[in-house]
Amino acid sequence: MTIQREIDQEINCASCQAKIDLEKYLQAHKVCPVCNHHGIMGAEERLNLIVDAGTFIEHDTELYSVNTLGFPDYETKLDRDTKKTGRPYELLSGTGQIGKHNVALSIGDVSFIGGTMGAVAGEKLTRT
C-alpha cells in the first residue's frame, strides 16, 4: 500500500499572517500579495532572477570564513550555514551577463550568518 502525503500548498505571510498560495508567492519572487512583505531570498535565487541563464562564473571560491575576532559560537554558525548554503562565505561574486551585457556583480546572502560582511565578503567585494 502506498501512502501519499499531501504537501501544504499555502504559507502564512511572515508579516501579516495572510494565507498565500505557495505557487503564486514564488512566482511573485517571495513578495506577499496582501501586504507586499518581501520574504527571504537566497543569493542563488536572486542571481537566477538577475543574470542571463548559464552566463554566471563565480570568482574566488577558494576563500572561506574564519573566526579571527573570537566570537562565541562563530564556528558552529559557520558550519551550520556552510551546510545550509553550500558555501563557506556570505557573498556570491563573479561575472556574467544581464541582457547580453557583461557585468561583474556581488550578491549577499542573509541565510549565511544573517548576511553580515566579514573579511571574506570584503575581500570578494573588492576583487569583483
Please state what every model-predicted region is.
Residues M1-T128:
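Terminal-region recognition feature
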